[in-house]
């Protein structure tokens, strides 16, 4: 394992602990354990592992939506956050390489005339996505 410099450790843990921001709105990445109320999932596991490597205590900070998680970056509420990289967010947040890629698709009712991407990707077709998610940010700019 690569040695973490004291400067990097100080940058990542300015409060003496690693504050990990997670998006509770994406069950593929994190969820609340119904029995304990604790957050769990890949984002939580990665945050805890980073804290272990930094030899720092970890505080998991959950946000109901990715938009709220992204907004909290400006106030310094978290040190490391797990959310989709998107050019709009990159104005305020420095992103690493992706730790996971999630494919998205369309869900339509039976008998829908929308059977192919070309049927959907045209003016006048509305697509429901979580507000201020990476999906919405992508669709808004393309």
Where do the model's predicted regions map?
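Residues that cap or flank secondary-structure elements
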Residues: 38-39, 61, 108, 127
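Short loop->beta-strand "edge-of-pocket" segments that line small-molecule binding or catalytic clefts
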Residues: 17-23, 40, 118-136
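Acidic, polar ligand-binding/catalytic clefts
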Residues: 48, 52, 57-121
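Active-site/binding-pocket entry motifs
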Residues: 25-28, 87, 113, 134
């Amino acid at each position: 394992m690569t040695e973490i410099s004291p400067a990097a450790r100080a940058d990542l843990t300015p409060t003496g602990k690693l504050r990990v921001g997670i998006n509770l709105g994406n069950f593929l990445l994190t969820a609340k354990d119904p029995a304990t109320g604790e957050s769990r999932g890949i984002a939580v596991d990665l945050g805890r592992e980073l804290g272990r490597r930094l030899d720092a205590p970890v505080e998991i900070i959950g946000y109901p939506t990715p938009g709220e998680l992204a907004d909290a970056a400006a106030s310094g509420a978290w040190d490391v956050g797990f959310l989709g990289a998107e050019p709009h967010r990159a104005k305020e947040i420095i992103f690493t390489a992706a730790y996971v890629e999630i494919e998205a698709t369309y869900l339509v009712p039976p008998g829908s005339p929308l059977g192919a991407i070309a049927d959907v990707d045209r003016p006048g077709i509305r697509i429901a996505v979580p507000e201020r998610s990476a999906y919405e940010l992508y669709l808004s700019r393309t």
